């Protein structure tokens, strides 16, 4: 690489071409293979000793959801924020850092101290961080989920929106990053505020909305079901929108729907994309599946059908 503003393998790959890039990788590997840095079984075993299984108790699996069906807030949290565990009687709990009014992934020092204490009480002293900008208590006994939920609520860490529209991935953007072409956090704030209705979000279902302030793509916009990329046009901030991106075993790069938008237009753009999805989806179909079945044409048509008012410019920092 020769440009710190474009420090990504994808940019180097495009510049060199697949064949030349592959040739150089293979040449480098031939030089390194069987060298002094080769991982031996002895070294593997040494490191593995630090990752022994926890002292799990012998427990029976509990149908917590069935026993708490009448408690809708808790049931919603169980549905979105609690995941199955390979050990009977345990669950993995995601702590949402996506409460409306808070920058995606942000936590205060007090919240982090609180989570550290919870980890000691509920999860063998272990906390994990996800690339979706949330936290995980990976080993919680199912019988203690209700108690944990109540404690998380007291610190604003129990928003039941994991995997939903407001579980936004966003880079710091122009407010905090010198490489950014545009702000990301005010866009995330405006979208979260516009769709701050958990019933609506649960109806929309699984959807990944990712925002990056520049082509370095720290917000993974290119693999978001809806991706937003900040771009610079003659010193002004604009936002390019793509749909159909996906991560995981069915990974895909999103396709750009058309010309970019100003910051004040973005919540309405997202609204029109969701309207198209609701009108076109079949039962049980996720947003990304609808895009995969129909392509971007119906989404593009609806978004650009009528002009979107420019509105007021985004504030310097919606979270200040």
Whereabouts are the PLM-identified features?
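Peripheral terminal and linker regions in Fe-S/redox and tRNA-modifying enzymes
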Residues: 1-320
């Amino acid at each position: 690489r020769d440009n710190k503003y474009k420090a990504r393998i994808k940019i180097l790959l495009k510049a060199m071409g697949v064949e030349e890039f592959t040739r150089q990788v293979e040449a480098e590997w031939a030089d390194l293979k069987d060298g002094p840095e080769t991982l031996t079984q002895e070294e593997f075993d040494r490191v593995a000793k630090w990752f022994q299984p926890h002292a799990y108790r012998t427990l029976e699996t509990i149908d917590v959801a069935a026993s708490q069906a009448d408690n809708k807030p808790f049931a919603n949290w169980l549905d979105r924020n609690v995941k199955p565990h390979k050990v009977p009687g345990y669950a993995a709990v995601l702590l949402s850092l996506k409460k409306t009014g808070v920058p995606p992934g942000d936590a205060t020092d007090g919240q982090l101290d609180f989570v550290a204490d919870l980890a000691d009480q509920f999860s063998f002293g272990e906390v994990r961080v996800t690339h979706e900008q949330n936290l995980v208590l990976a080993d919680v006994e199912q019988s203690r989920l209700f108690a944990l939920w109540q404690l998380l609520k007291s610190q604003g860490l129990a928003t039941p929106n994991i995997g939903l529209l407001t579980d936004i991935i966003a880079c710091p953007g122009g407010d905090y990053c010198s490489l950014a072409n545009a702000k990301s956090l005010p866009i995330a704030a405006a979208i979260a505020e516009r769709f701050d209705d958990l019933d609506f979000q649960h109806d929309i279902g699984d959807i990944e909305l990712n925002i990056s302030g520049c082509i370095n793509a720290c917000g993974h916009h290119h693999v978001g079901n809806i991706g937003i990329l900040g771009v610079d046009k003659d010193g002004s901030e604009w936002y390019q929108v793509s749909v159909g991106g996906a991560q995981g075993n069915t990974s895909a790069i999103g396709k750009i729907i058309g010309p970019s938008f100003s910051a004040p237009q973005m919540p309405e753009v997202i609204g029109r994309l969701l309207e198209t999805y609701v009108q076109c989806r079949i039962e049980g179909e996720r947003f990304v599946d609808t895009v995969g079945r129909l392509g971007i044409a119906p989404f593009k048509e609806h978004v650009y059908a009528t002009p979107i008012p420019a509105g007021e410019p985004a504030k310097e920092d919606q979270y200040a």
